[in-house]
Each structure stands twice: as structure tokens, then as C-alpha cells.
């Protein structure tokens, strides 16, 4: 596999930075620094937008499927005034990078709307920590003929 001509990018993570991991349909793992996303929002202030979970078909069944380890008891305690954070994804969709518990609380309590931010594509690139390609299967070897007969791979 040839190396990229592009110089490696240095990513700094603080001990308290929250990193969100997402595995797409191809098996590629994406890791984003959500804490840095909020810092970028502070550096380029913008008003929060509104997100309506029901408009996207989000209910508790959906949340439990997408986030199997969701702590519903903790979700009941989170601050709904803090905007959730989306980032644009390469397939034209948006990915929730931070705010799963806030989203769960809103759905559980029937709160129709949450404040949210969406990073720009440039900001999303800045908060990308690493993209790990899917694990590939080792190539299948063809049987070999040897002096003792056909050898299985």
C-alpha cells in the first residue's frame, strides 16, 4: 500500500476531550473531537438552530438501536439548554457528534425541539481525529501443487 504524499496531520487531544466514534455502512471508523467542535463554535459564534427529533423519525427504539449503551437514567439529568452538535458527513447526511443523552431526554419527555449546531465541512475536517478504513479480509490463496500433492491454502 503506497504512502500518501500528504504530510501527517497532528491532532492534539486533551485528557477531558470527548471523542465521538461512528462506524459507517462500509465499516470505516470515524473519530471526531466533539470538544474541539464546541471550541470552534465559540471562535466563530452563530445562533443555534432548532432540531425536531420527530421530523427525523427519532424515537427511543431508534436511539436504543443507534446507541446500545445509552444510559437512560443519566439522560434524565442532562441540561437540555446546551445545544447538541451535528457535523456534515460525506454522503450528504449529518451525524450527531455530541448530545445523545440530551436527545434521549427530549424524546423521553416529549420535548419537541432541541437547540443544535452544525459544523461547516471545514470545521468537521478540523475535528476529525482519525478515519480508519474497514478491516479487510486476508486474500484467499489458491491451492498449490507440491511434490506430495495438492496443498490447501
Pin down the residues of each PLM region.
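Enriched - but not universal
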Residues: 33-35, 77, 103
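Intrinsically disordered, low-complexity segments enriched in proline/serine/threonine
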Residues: 4, 9-10, 47-50, 55, ...
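Short alpha-helix boundary/capping and kink motifs at helix termini
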Residues: 40-97, 107
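Glycine-rich short-loop/terminal segments
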Residues: 1-65
